[in-house]
Swiss-Prot record:
NCBIfam families: rep_term_tus. One of its GO terms (cellular component) is cytoplasm. Pfam families: Ter. The keyword Cytoplasm applies. GO terms for biological process: DNA replication termination. Trans-acting protein required for termination of DNA replication. Binds to DNA replication terminator sequences (terA to terF) to prevent the passage of replication forks. The termination efficiency will be affected by the affinity of this protein for the terminator sequence. Belongs to the Tus family. The keyword Signal does not apply. This is DNA replication terminus site-binding protein. It is found in: Cytoplasm. One of its GO terms (molecular function) is DNA binding. Keywords: Cytoplasm, DNA replication, DNA-binding. The gene is tus.
Length: 309
């Protein structure tokens, strides 16, 4: 497929996402809102976009106010829709839930509508990350040449739909991106970097090359069977824990955007019990279960690369 055809498909798919999101928000407003609870988080400024989040103060919104915030959030796709001071790199998150009363027919209609939106979002992400054939650093420029100001993460984010929950509880999750690597895989990556000399502020080209050579030597000195692990921290994430009484099971969802809960009164479902979201405080985290961590030694800090001792 030619680059021109891909751009045409990219623009066409994005227009469909916008149209279907507009139709969904109109459709939801035609349904009876049983309960709504969302939690706005402080905006991240451009100056603080890389700073660690040690505390997060939560503001609760209820009812129609919560619904209005949520429906606007679903369609928040461009930086032009937000404050000039707000970071365009930090994700805009609005955890919470909207609960709507449905019958069998309207439940199926909304399920199909949301499934279609999620399919389009997945297709759009595939075009950008795979079909474009571009490295991650070049994708930003390519996408924004055709869709100026697009917040790609918001375009990729799918909507979470649940049916007839009994209880919904919110909380925070601290996670790491973990990837296991062999010594030879890391050496191969470093070789590629060494073969393409460049400067990386605050280092000059020569200083960066020397730094890479030292890293290569450190990895090469390890036994071939050494167990290496990238363990990169991810900023704390809001989550929702959903309890289904009939199935007697709990399901956990990431909750960067309000969940849509359909309550089917034809089947006798009732309004769920919805909890709040506490302020986040990194110094006061209580772990339900924290397994014994494997002893790791940091070997390349910039890559968050560790070796198992």
């Amino acid at each position: 497929m030619s680059r021109y055809d891909l751009v045409e498909r990219l623009n066409g798919t994005f227009r469909q996402i916008e149209q279907h999101l507009a139709a969904l928000t109109d459709n939801l407003q035609q349904h009876s809102l049983l309960i709504a609870r969302v939690f706005s988080l402080p905006q991240v400024t451009k100056e603080a976009e890389h700073a660690p989040l040690d505390t997060i103060e939560v503001t609760q919104h209820l009812g129609k106010e919560a619904e209005a915030l949520a429906l606007r959030h679903y369609r928040h796709l461009f930086i032009q829709q937000q404050s000039e001071n707000r970071s365009s790199k930090a994700a805009v998150r609005l955890p919470g839930v909207l609960c709507y009363q449905v019958d069998n027919a309207t439940q199926l209609d909304l399920e199909n509508q949301i499934q279609r939106i999620n399919q389009l979002k997945t297709t759009f992400e595939q075009m950008v990350t795979v079909e474009s054939g571009l490295p991650s650093a070049a994708r930003f420029e390519w996408v924004h040449r055709h869709l100026p100001g697009l917040i790609t993460l918001n375009a990729y984010r799918t909507l979470t739909l649940i049916n007839n929950p009994a209880t919904i509880r919110f909380g925070w999750a601290n996670k790491h991106i973990i990837k296991n690597l062999s010594r030879d895989e890391v050496l191969s990556q470093l070789k590629k970097s060494l073969a393409s000399p460049r400067s990386v502020p605050p280092w000059t080209r020569e200083q960066w090359q020397f730094k890479l050579e030292r890293e290569y030597q450190d990895i090469a000195a390890l036994p071939q069977q050494a167990r290496l692990k990238i363990k990169r921290p991810v900023k704390v994430q809001p989550i929702a824990r959903i309890w289904y009484k009939g199935q007697q099971k709990q399901v956990q969802h990431a909750c960067p955007t309000p969940i849509i809960a359909l309550i089917n009164t034809d089947n006798g479902a009732g309004v769920p019990d919805i909890g709040g979201l506490e302020n986040y405080d990194a110094d006061n985290i209580q772990h339900r279960f924290k397994p014994q961590a494997q002893p790791l030694r940091l070997i390349i800090p910039r890559l968050h690369l560790y070796v198992a001792d």
